[in-house]
Amino acid sequence: MSKEKFKRIKPHINVGTIGHVDHGKTTLTAAITTVLSKKYGGYARAFDQIDNAPEEKARGITINTSHVEYDTAYRHYAHVDCPGHADYIKNMITGAAQMDGAILVVAATDGPMPQTREHILLARQVGVPHIIVFMNKCDMVNDEELLELVEMEMRELLSQYDFPGDNTPIIRGSALKALENDEIWSNKILELSDALDNYIPEPKRVVDQPFLLPIEDVFSISGRGTVVTGRIERGVIRVGEEIEIVGIKDTIKTTCTGVEMFRKLLDEGRAGENVGVLLRGTKRDEVERGQVLSKPGYIKPHSHFESEVYILNKDEGGRHTPFFKGYRPQFYFRTTDITGTIELPEGADMVMPGDNIRMIVHLIAPIAMDDGLRFAIREGGRTIGAGIVSKIIS
């Protein structure tokens, strides 16, 4: 069966669900596709179709990111259902990087929980520009004052992490009731879709900048070659163009022989779109997650840089004790984690939780990098800091 061409009519926006485990992120994702498909066409996706990787089923928690698509009155959305469990924040960092805006799900029955806070912090550090709050499970709360209290707490929490808490849309709903076709609660999903259309501005796509795509996954397709997938960070890739694979290993040149999105073929892929890129003559083992595809000559791999870093305090889920020079955590860049060693500025012997500090980092492998690139610092499965590359040394 030949693949159908993707029709590019409405503006395309990337969003996703974030929030504490079991607050209803995946149920809400299913409810959005179900309610909007009835009104604007498209496909409804059931809860278990979204929550579908085998390891997710076994533990009843979402580990991998699931992509769904839907239409509103004015836009086409690609939606990522992000992992919610603390063990899997590693994936959250790569998933949340794919958002023009996030839908933060908080259960009205619980209010904000530790992961609610952690996800807001992560959204801040991976550069998610806008958050909309969906207060879920409101059908289970009869007390109006309690709902107002949760709403107030959410606004304060968002403001604490430099999001405009006072102006953030907060929709009170019930994803489960909306899935069950309850009209009152289905209308809340439409209210959410209006908030998406009106509150998340159409991003200024960086299509005019040189092409860059952080690689998330690599597949081998028999008879066609190697396909890499990811979200185009900037620029445009056209079929037939020469590109470079940069980072971790030696840089290699290749040619793009195909671009596809949601299993439909495109002549080109643009900034902000999740695509698969087919590479000519590239072997599956020559390319890996964490590298980037780039316009030749525009980005170089580096392993030694100066950075501005914030180290979380223990109340934010960070370390309880200081660390010293020579400390070796993991640094998460775009889609990958690389071990690195730190050097502290002269006169600084140690770094306390809660400190903001300039540090020099030596990575064990080079990463495609420019000034201004953001990263997370992790150890033992938890985020302990956030940083930005302020100056490349080598």
Curated annotation (Swiss-Prot):
EC number per UniProt: 3.6.5.3
Enzyme class, broadest EC rank: hydrolase
Keyword Glycoprotein found: no
Residue segments, region G2: 60-64
An example Gene Ontology CC term for this record: cytosol
Sequence segments annotated as region (G5): 174-176
Keyword line: Cytoplasm, Elongation factor, GTP-binding, Hydrolase, Magnesium, Metal-binding, Nucleotide-binding, Protein biosynthesis
PROSITE patterns for this protein: G_TR_1, G_TR_2
Subcellular location: Cytoplasm
Annotated stretches, region: G3: 81-84
Catalysis performed (reactions): GTP + H2O = GDP + phosphate + H(+)
Region annotation G4: where it falls in the sequence: 136-139
Region of interest called G1, as start-end residue ranges on this chain: 19-26
The keyword Kinase appears for this protein: no
Residues that coordinate or bind Mg(2+): 26
Domain tr-type G residue range list: 10-204
Main location: cytoplasm
Tree of life domain: Bacteria
MF terms (GO), sorted A to Z: GTP binding; GTPase activity; guanosine tetraphosphate binding; translation elongation factor activity
Binding site for GTP: 19-26, 81-85, 136-139
Record-stated family: Belongs to the TRAFAC class translation factor GTPase superfamily. Classic translation factor GTPase family. EF-Tu/EF-1A subfamily.
Role: GTP hydrolase that promotes the GTP-dependent binding of aminoacyl-tRNA to the A-site of ribosomes during protein biosynthesis.
Record note on quaternary structure: Monomer.
Protein name in UniProt: Elongation factor Tu
Gene of this entry: tuf
